[in-house]
A protein has these predicted regions:
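Distinct, well-ordered alpha-helical segments
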Residues: 6, 17-32, 47-55
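Conserved, mostly hydrophobic/aromatic
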Residues: 13, 37, 54, 64, ...
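Glycine-enriched alpha-helix->loop->beta-strand junction motifs that scaffold or abut catalytic
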Residues: 10, 27-36, 53-62, 104
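His/Asp/Glu-enriched short active-site or ligand-binding loop at hydrolase and phosphoryl-transfer sites
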Residues: 36-43, 58-72
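Terminal-tail/helix-coil boundary detector
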Residues: 56, 118-164
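Single conserved hydrophobic/aromatic residue that forms the stacking wall/gate
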Residues: 1-5, 9
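Catalytic beta/alpha-barrel core
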Residues: 10-19, 35-45
């Protein structure tokens, strides 16, 4: 990447699923830092240390799987439902607002127009410190989706065919 970085047409790069150690290694061997790191981030896997590191390094934290792919009953979780009811919102909106208030960029996937509109309607309410702490208490510190530090998992992802 270093030779490409000196090109007149240089652009910002982004990375995905880079842990702090992998990013530090990247910094040591390249001239340009990524502008964004997309990592799994949701109420059950909050990536608190990564968020601090990314902020210190001037790299934007982007959430991948902000709704934990529906794992662990996220849309029925009592803490999230209580907050949603208090604000007259959906659990999805509460999660998106929580990420936004933490400075985490999120681009939620949806194919339904109504859901897209709902996902955008998060900027006219604010979660209290108490609500933010309540959501912080849901962190398990690990992914309910997959372990990207597990060698067989990484090999499987690397050999997964996306298109014919």
């Amino acid at each position: 990447y270093s030779s490409a970085a000196s090109d007149v047409y240089k652009r910002q790069i982004g990375v995905t699923s880079f842990g702090n150690e992998r990013l530090q290694d990247l910094f040591l061997h390249n001239e340009v830092k990524p502008a964004v790191n997309q990592i799994e981030t949701h109420p059950f896997f909050q990536q608190k240390e990564a968020n601090v590191f990314l902020q210190q390094e001037g790299i934007q934290h982007e959430a991948w799987a902000p709704f934990a792919e529906g794992k662990n009953g996220i849309f029925q979780h009592p803490v999230l439902k209580t907050i949603a009811e208090k604000h007259g919102r959906t659990v999805g909106q509460v999660i998106l607002r929580w990420l936004n208030q933490r400075g985490v960029v999120v681009i939620p996937k949806s194919v339904r127009k109504e859901r897209m509109m709902e996902n955008l309607d998060i900027f006219n309410f604010t979660l209290t410190d108490e609500e933010m702490k309540g959501i912080a208490g849901l962190d398990t510190g690990k992914s309910p989706i997959y372990d990207d530090m597990d060698l067989p998992t990484v090999r499987g992802i690397g050999t997964h065919k996306i298109h014919d």
